[in-house]
Amino acid sequence: MIHNGSTPRRFVFGNNDANERIVPEEYKYNSSMINELIKQNKDLHKQVTEKQEEIDRLNVLIGSFRAKLIKYTELNKKMQRDQQEQQHNRHQSFESKPRYKAEFTSESSSPVSNERDSEYLQIKKNNRHDENKIDDIYQKLELLTNLVNDAIHKQNNGEQREPSNFNSRIVSDDDIIISESQEFKQLQDQIDLLKRKLLIKKENELRKLSLNKELADLMDELSMNSSPSANQNIDPYSELSSRPKSGQQRRTNEDQQSLHCEHCHLKSHTQSHPSEPRFVNLKESLETPTPTPTQTPRKLKREKDTNVADKQYSLW
């Protein structure tokens, strides 16, 4: 049953794994770190605003206390000035009057009237002195107020700059994380490239060694095949045709012994005097004569005997 105002749920039939994407662990870790940093940023912003409100309240209290302090200092200075003026007037009144009158007035209650008279007589002088003092006081107060205002402005500017510096520091942390992940990826790519190059280099070296080995084997076989072919070219065909079968067998045995001796002599010579590597034309050496249909059975038999000798020579 669907209630009013509620939306029906959608059910997806089939394999849910196909709809989900595989997210690497690095991205998950980075997202969790970013969420934590955002949360810390919000908490710190709250703390900063609370501290700012406290600072504003304290600034208000400081301003009120400062005004009271200025007021009381002015009252204190005024009272001090009044006392100094009274003392000065008394001293002048005592000096201006005769001795007997001063002695009489000191014991009686007439000093108040004398002070008033002295003040009345010296109004201009006292007013000038007071005006100078007041001007000095006002100048000092202006200097103090300017200094206090400058200090307050500097403090407020510093407090306003702290959140901006904090925000920039947070942004710089995110940038550092992203840059580090990019650097790691670049290093991984470089390592994979170097591994690939090393594998290719090793494969080329192995291939080069195998080809050199095959070339050396072919050269050895060609050198071994060239020596019996030279001996066969020296023997004339007339002697082979005139001799009987027993003579041919004797000659094959002698050829085998001579080939064995030559092989031993060649081996000892190569062991005592290693020769330089020979460069043979592979195309010319691989070209073997093919039997033509005009050859006689005697020639075919002779070539068969030479092939048997070559095989025995290779076995030796």
UniProtKB/Swiss-Prot annotation:
Keywords: Coiled coil, Cytoplasm, Cytoskeleton, Nucleus
Main location: nucleus
One cellular-component annotation, GO: nucleus
Keyword Nucleus in record: yes
Bias kind Basic and acidic residues: ranges: 78-104
Any coiled-coil regions, as ranges: 32-223
UniProt cross-references to InterPro entries, sorted A to Z: Spc42 (IPR021611)
Top-level taxon of the source organism: Eukaryota
Localization annotation: Nucleus; Cytoplasm, Cytoskeleton, Microtubule organizing center, Spindle pole body
Region (Disordered): 78-118, 224-257, 281-316
Function as written in the Swiss-Prot or TrEMBL entry: Forms a polymeric layer at the periphery of the spindle pole body (SPB) central plaque which has an essential function during SPB duplication and may facilitate attachment of the SPB to the nuclear membrane.
Family: Belongs to the SPC42 family.
Name of this protein: Spindle pole body component SPC42
Native organism: Kluyveromyces lactis (strain ATCC 8585 / CBS 2359 / DSM 70799 / NBRC 1267 / NRRL Y-1140 / WM37)
